[in-house]
Amino acid sequence: MIVGHGIDLQDISAIEKVYLRNARFARKVLTDKELALFEQFSHNRKMTYLAGRWAGKEAFSKAMGTGIGQLTFQDIEIINDSKGRPVITKSPFQGKAFISISHSGGYVQASVILEDLA
């Protein structure tokens, strides 16, 4: 049974402005595994990746019904599988979490659906 659905839309340039003011912003949003991948990318790809992870984690927190205030960005990890599909590999949710991240123009959109397996 679906127990939560969250969506977030993020302007990539807004994330870039924050990152350029303080590169530690990436460390706040990304887990160690996500950060290791982030460090391998070109600047433009870094900004798209960071915005996508931000949007994905915001969408997850909305699906949980808590908002990011009761969760931290470090509580949620999103890693791409071998086909490039984003997968939530770490979260406080005990059921199944589905995520989709889409990039278009200067924006990133993420959608998360939470399913209770009980």
Swiss-Prot record:
EC number(s) reported in the record: 2.7.8.7
A GO term for molecular function: holo-[acyl-carrier-protein] synthase activity
BP GO annotations: fatty acid biosynthetic process
Location of this chain's protein in the cell: Cytoplasm
Cofactor: Mg(2+)
UniProt keyword rRNA processing present: no
Enzyme class label: transferase
Any one Pfam family match given in the protein's UniProt record, by short name: ACPS
Alphabetic keyword roster: Cytoplasm, Fatty acid biosynthesis, Fatty acid metabolism, Lipid biosynthesis, Lipid metabolism, Magnesium, Metal-binding, Transferase
InterPro entries the UniProt entry points to: 4-PPantetheinyl_Trfase_dom, 4-PPantetheinyl_Trfase_dom_sf, ACPS, Ppantetheine-prot_Trfase_dom
Coiled-coil region list: none
Main location: cytoplasm
S-S pairs: none
Catalytically driven reaction(s): apo-[ACP] + CoA = holo-[ACP] + adenosine 3',5'-bisphosphate + H(+)
GO cellular component: cytoplasm
Binding residues annotated for Mg(2+), in chain numbering: D8, E58
Family of the protein in this entry: Belongs to the P-Pant transferase superfamily. AcpS family.
UniProt cross-references to HAMAP family, sorted A to Z: AcpS
Function statement: Transfers the 4'-phosphopantetheine moiety from coenzyme A to a Ser of acyl-carrier-protein.
Name this protein carries in UniProt: Holo-[acyl-carrier-protein] synthase
Gene that this sequence comes from: acpS
